């Protein structure tokens, strides 16, 4: 029962995030949203993580839909890679960064230093994540 409630809340949060993303030109179909949810579960398993609550996916969609570098034609793949990077960075920093701060740091690096290159973003060190997140903390 609790699982069904969380799934319903996740779907509602995704719908709200996707409505906001549409304002930035990112339109995700229901099939693409479902694919992102499946990828989310796989990413969590691969990262050895368990997520309580709605997780980062809705906020990640909202945050990166504003990026000029996000390839809207290949958004599911890029958003999946960004989810993987988020959880890898959380593991690397031992979950000491707030989700919002890490997302802001990711976006700053993705749009700046990395020029939209997810491989470059994934290669960042713990020190870089901490420094960038600190710049964005409390916003």
Q: Which residues make up each language-model segment?
A:
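Generic detector of well-ordered alpha-helical segments enriched in charged/polar residues
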Residues: 7, 11, 15, 58-61, ...
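Amphipathic alpha-helical binding modules
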Residues: 76-139
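Arginine residue identity/basic-tract feature
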Residues: 19, 33, 40, 45, ...
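Charged, low-complexity interaction regions
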Residues: 21-31, 46-51, 68-73, 91-97, ...
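Short, charged early-sequence alpha-helical segments and their helix-coil boundaries
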Residues: 44-81, 121-125
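Short intrinsically disordered terminal tails
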Residues: 1-4, 64-66, 135-139
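N-terminal interaction modules that seed assembly of large macromolecular complexes
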Residues: 2-57
